[in-house]
Regions:
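Cys-nucleophile CN-hydrolase/nitrilase-fold catalytic domain and related Cys-dependent amidase chemistry
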Residues: 17, 25-106, 112, 183-205
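CN hydrolase (nitrilase-like) catalytic-core segments centered on the catalytic cysteine
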Residues: 62-83, 151, 157-246
C-alpha cells in the first residue's frame, strides 16, 4: 500500500448518455491533473433516465458497449484506476444489474460489483417512491480487491444502510471503501454524512463517497456532498453541491497508526448473546 491521491467525482447526470460521458471525462481529467491515481464516479453517472425503464434500453453486456469502452479508454489514457460508478449490465428476466466495474491504469477491467441492496422505499415527508427491484436484479457477492493503494472494497448507495456488508468486507482486509451513490436530497440531508463516516470509522478504513448532486432533468434532486473520509471518521474533503471533484491523500501510515492505537476490529466478541 502506497500513499495515493484519490478523487470523488460529483455530477448531476441527465438522460443524455453522450453528454454524461463528456462531463464525466472532463471531471476525471480534472482529477488526474490534480494528481489523482484513483477516481470514483457516482451511481448512474452515465444515465439518469426520465423513467426507471430507460436503463433497460441502455443496458450493456459485460465486456462491450459505449459506457465500458469509455471507462477502459479513460483509465488507460490517464493512467489511473477508475471505479466506474454504476452502469446497467444485462441480467436475467428482462432486468439489469446496477454494476460497478473497476478498471486499472492499463484499462483492464479488474473487478465487478453488483448492487446488493435495492432501494424500494417511499421517502418519508415526500411523495417520492422508488422501486429499483422492478428493473434491477440484486447482486449476491461483496467485492474487495487488491490494488497498488491497498485493498479496495466497493458498495453502492443504499448498501450504506447495511453495516453487516461492510464488516464482511473488513474481515477480508479492506483499506479503502468506494461508494458510488445517488442519495436523494431528503435522505441525504438526514443520513448521508452519518452513514459514510460511520462505515469508515467502524471498519477503520478510508471512504471515497461519490454522490450525484443537483437538479436532474427528470425532476429529481440529489444531495451531493461527495466526500473523502479517513479511518478516524474525519471528513478530509467535501463538495456540497454541483458538478466537480474532491481530492485527498490516502496515507498508509495514518491508516496503520489509527488501527494500532484503536484496534476495535480485534476486540469483537461475537460469541456473546
Amino acid at each position: 500500500m502506497t500513499k495515493t491521491m484519490c478523487a470523488a467525482v460529483q455530477m448531476a447526470s441527465s438522460p443524455n448518455l453522450g453528454a454524461n460521458l463528456i462531463e464525466a471525462g472532463r471531471l476525471i481529467e480534472k482529477a488526474a491533473a490534480q494528481g489523482a491515481a484513483l477516481v470514483v464516479l457516482p451511481e448512474n453517472f452515465a444515465l439518469m433516465g426520465m423513467v426507471e425503464t430507460d436503463k433497460l434500453e441502455a443496458a450493456e453486456t459485460e465486456g462491450s458497449g459505449p459506457i465500458q469502452e469509455f471507462l477502459a479508454r479513460t483509465a488507460e489514457r490517464l493512467k489511473l484506476w477508475l471505479v466506474g460508478g454504476t452502469l446497467p449490465i444485462r441480467a436475467s428476466k428482462g432486468k439489469v444489474h446496477a454494476t460497478s466495474l473497476i478498471f486499472d491504469d492499463r484499462g483492464n477491467q479488474v473487478g465487478r460489483y453488483d448492487k446488493i441492496h435495492l432501494f424500494d422505499v417511499n421517502v418519508p415527508g415526500t411523495e417520492e417512491q422508488y422501486r429499483e427491484s422492478h428493473t434491477i436484479e440484486a447482486g449476491e457477492h461483496a467485492l474487495v480487491l487488491d490494488t497498488p493503494f491497498g485493498r479496495l472494497g466497493v458498495a453502492i448507495c443504499y448498501d450504506l444502510r447495511f453495516p453487516e456488508l461492510f464488516r464482511q468486507m473488513a474481515d477480508t482486509g479492506m483499506d479503502i471503501l468506494a461508494v458510488p451513490s445517488a442519495f436523494t436530497a431528503q435522505t441525504g440531508a438526514a443520513h448521508w454524512e452519518i452513514l459514510v463516516r460511520a462505515r469508515a470509522l467502524e471498519n477503520l478504513c478510508y471512504a471515497i463517497a461519490s454522490n450525484q448532486g443537483g437538479f436532474h432533468v427528470n425532476g429529481r434532486e440529489t444531495y451531493g456532498h461527495s466526500m473523502i473520509v479517513d479511518p478516524w471518521g474525519k471528513v478530509m474533503a467535501g463538495l456540497p453541491s454541483g458538478a466537480g471533484i474532491v481530492t485527498a491523500e490516502i496515507d498508509p501510515d495514518r491508516l496503520e497508526k489509527v488501527r494500532a492505537a484503536f484496534p476495535a476490529l480485534q476486540h469483537r466478541r461475537m460469541h456473546c448473546r
